[in-house]
Regions:
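Internal helical hairpin/lid segments
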Residues: 67-87
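Extended glycan-interaction surfaces of carbohydrate-active proteins
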Residues: 1-72, 94-143
């Protein structure tokens, strides 16, 4: 769903808040090319609205789950996969390193990361975050 005026992808026609899940149009679904203008515009907007000062990414604008404003490893890995597909290895590694540094001593990933401490926050040991981490690592190693 692309806004014809801004050329930015949105999660639906009723809501113009940015949502990192629209990157799914590039990966894994490959409906759009990572370098299409509407995708590039969307990524620029995601970086303005969802990227935190610690380099992690929020899920969507005004996300209030558990207080909001905490980056999600899964969202950050999704951005890493976008950057891999777009050929920006440096940014992909930056996202991947953020997630790696936020893991517990045993390597478990959390649902969110505390921006102040960079420690795992909330639920720890999520299958989807670990699966996305492995997928991202495999993609990094391919390049």
């Amino acid at each position: 769903l692309c806004d014809e005026n801004t050329k930015i992808l949105h999660r639906n026609t009723e809501d113009s808040k940015m949502d990192v899940s629209v990157i799914g149009t590039v990966y894994p679904f490959e409906l759009l090319s990572p370098n299409e203008k509407k995708v590039v515009n969307t990524v620029e907007k995601i970086n303005l609205t969802l990227r935190t000062y610690t380099s992690g990414y929020l899920r969507f604008e005004q996300d209030s789950y558990m207080g909001g404003n905490s980056p999600w490893p899964i969202a950050t890995l999704w951005m890493a996969l976008y950057y891999i597909k777009s050929g920006n290895r440096k940014k992909a590694l930056e996202c991947f390193e953020f997630v790696t540094k936020s893991a517990t001593k045993l390597g478990f990933l959390s649902e969110q990361v505390d921006n102040k401490t960079m420690k795992p926050n909330w639920v720890i040991g999520l299958g989807w975050s670990h699966a996305m981490y492995i997928i991202t690592l495999a993609e990094i190693l391919k390049k």
